[in-house]
Each structure stands twice: as structure tokens, then as C-alpha cells.
């Protein structure tokens, strides 16, 4: 498996040979930022197009098919239309909070991307508390949502923001405990070590029943954290027009829309990394020839294939189940998912303590 750290170290040494270390680090940070923005733009276009096609498939229709081959340029046209729209600020809104909220939401998505390993040696931050950093950074987004509801000075926006805040804060518990269940199995919170620990088998298979339960709970709770159906009540059109982004237009609305799909991909990426081996290829013990063939497939292809598989599962859930009421959403979390997650965490601890795992 190719190690991308060889390339990054070579670039770092080359820059150090022609300039001071401070300038070299500054240029590297700029390059990383440009790469992240480019990746974000590509992911947004692909995910929105994929959502429309998957939705059309489940509803027995074609989806976008007019602009470009198979409607492939429709998303780009929508982006250009959004860029040309006026950014309108309500007269009675708190201008500072109103304008700050979209940036808070998008910054939270940027930060969570930092510790996800796309390939061996291809992660921005690789440190021993990567799981804690991920959970902490992802919780910043709820602050932006609450600021959007309050700063808009609109009762529908405020109700949507309060619903979203209660929902996200509640489901973060299940997400955290599902991830910690797998941390107990591996014994580390560093994402690169978690992936390398799955060289001889993915955790969803090595962890037995507790790993499968944690994966299912993570998918449900992760979907709820992204405010996607059937947990999209904070922006229910029939009740709250558009929820906390009712008063937003132009690229301010675009930031919220973009953050939803980026958070969807982040949830899928974390699931692929922790449960499905990340960039690690599929290996079956005893089949050396098969394992050698799998090693020829680049790691980033494995990573994105697994991530988009999880994205498809989450889209399948959204377009299959009806929207839940707010009391049903919170009952599902506090009466079912949290107790099951706690028991599952203890069960995994017992499995590790007594060696009941592969």
C-alpha cells in the first residue's frame, strides 16, 4: 500500500531547502486549504447529484436529465444561480449573529475533515486523540444553528433552531458511545492506528455482535445529527417553512445546504474508517492470493467506495421512512438508543476483557 507521507515529506524537505521553515509551513497550510476547498466543491456536486438520482430511483422517476448528459451539469447550473442571488438580511435581524451563523456551520465541517485518513499517510492531523477532536469539532455546528435561529428574529427559525439543537445534542451521545465502543475494541483513539488495526479484518466483523449493534446505532444517530430524513423535523416545510434557514438567501443559504451534504459525507467517512477498515483493503485470512489482488487497489479508492456505500445507505433511509414528530425523535434517543448504547459499550468491554473477539 502506497504511503502518501513519502510525498508530503519530500515536498516539505524541498521547501525547506529553498526557504525558512516558517514560510514552508505557511505555504503547506495554504496548499492544504486549497486542496480541502477543492475536495469540498467536488464532493458537494457529486453528493447533490447522487441524492437527486437516488431519490428519483426510489420514487420511480428519472431525476435531473435535461442539463448535460444524464443531467450531470444540473448541479453546476444551480450553484451558478445561487452565486448570483442577492444576500438579503431581514430588517429586525441581529446582523452580526445572522451573518456569523453560516460560517460557524461550515467551519465545523472543515474542522472535522482534518483527522479523517483518506489513505495511508494522507490525513491532515494524525494525533493520539483524533476521536476526541472529531467529537469536539462536530459539536460546534449546533452553535451556528442556534445563532441562525436567534439572529434571524423569526419565530419559525427560532423553533427550528431549538428543535435542531435538542436533536443534535441528544444524538451526539449515541454517536459518541458507538464510536467509543470501537475504541474499546482497538485500544486507541488515533484514526491511523484504528485503520491499521483492521489489516486482518474489519471491526464490524472482528467485534462480533457489539460491533454490528454499534454500527446500526451510529447510522441512525449520525443521520439524526445531520438533520436528514426521517429526522429532518427542524426544517419541516409543512410546519416551519424551512426551519432555521428560513430567512437566509444566496450563498448564506448555500453554506447551510453545503454543510448538510458535507456532514453527510463526514458521517459516512467516520463509519467507513472505524467499522469498515477505512483505506484498508478487504483481506480474508487464509486466502493469500485474494489478499494480494486486493492490495493492488489503491487505498483511497477503498476509502471512497466504502464512504459512498454508507452515503447510499443513509439516502436509502431518508427516502424510505416517513418524517418523525419531535417527541418521537427524542423518545427514540433517550428511551432506546442511549440505554442500548450504554449496554453495548459494557458488552464490548466484557468481550475485550475475556478475549471474545477475533
UniProtKB/Swiss-Prot annotation:
Record keyword Cell inner membrane present: yes
Catalytic activity, EC: 7.1.1.-
Principal location listed in the UniProt entry: membrane
One of the protein's GO biological processes: aerobic respiration
Catalytic activity: a quinone + NADH + 5 H(+)(in) = a quinol + NAD(+) + 4 H(+)(out)
Enzyme class: translocase
Subcellular localization(s) per the UniProt record: Cell inner membrane
Function noted in UniProt: NDH-1 shuttles electrons from NADH, via FMN and iron-sulfur (Fe-S) centers, to quinones in the respiratory chain. The immediate electron acceptor for the enzyme in this species is believed to be ubiquinone. Couples the redox reaction to proton translocation (for every two electrons transferred, four hydrogen ions are translocated across the cytoplasmic membrane), and thus conserves the redox energy in a proton gradient. This subunit may bind ubiquinone.
Name under which the protein is recorded: NADH-quinone oxidoreductase subunit H
Species of origin: Bacteroides thetaiotaomicron (strain ATCC 29148 / DSM 2079 / JCM 5827 / CCUG 10774 / NCTC 10582 / VPI-5482 / E50)
